[in-house]
Amino acid sequence: MEEKKKYRFADEKEQLKRVNSFLATGYTIFYIVILSVSWESYFRGVRTLGYTGLLSVLTLIAMAINFLSTRKDKSQSRSRKIAFICFVVIAFLMAYAYDSYYVRFIAAIPFCGYVLLYDKKNVAVTGGIYFALNVFVNIIRIGVQHAYPKEVAIDHIYATFAIGLLIVLIYAITSVAEQFKRDTE
């Protein structure tokens, strides 16, 4: 008689646990980068202690919420939603306060993990929200505050366009992964 192999990730609940753990790691990396960037900018005199402290407290709270919600039940989609809300708040504060493009692109780390969910709608919604956040920041910084000279403003617009393309690419990869999963079931 042939022995059946047991595959740990054949169970969808086990898959969700692994994906949520992967996403939590991605968010943690994002938050660590945010903390290091904000403190480094404080020590260079670019940001005040008040802003850096506030951002640090919010980032540490987001990290704790992310950790606790993922630890409580790793298979819940609720923990992903909570983590994303915290992410959006921190990403907005960083996109608004910092001109560096890498700060906006580092946010792609958690989005890469969404491919493992095989959920195009999730990628479209969360990616759309993140893209809209970047457009909103550009409207405020370029259109309302006139914070940049023309050349720099154009660079920010192209960076936002590139973020949109990256999200579209992640969506396309998720779509293909979803098709592969369906075809192999």
Over which residues does each language-model region extend?
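Hydrophobic transmembrane alpha-helices and their membrane-interface boundaries in multi-pass
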Residues: 22-99, 106-113, 130
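Alpha-helix N-cap/helix-start motif
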Residues: 103-104, 125
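Polar/charged heptad-repeat coiled-coil helices used as signal-transmission/dimerization stalks
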Residues: 179-185
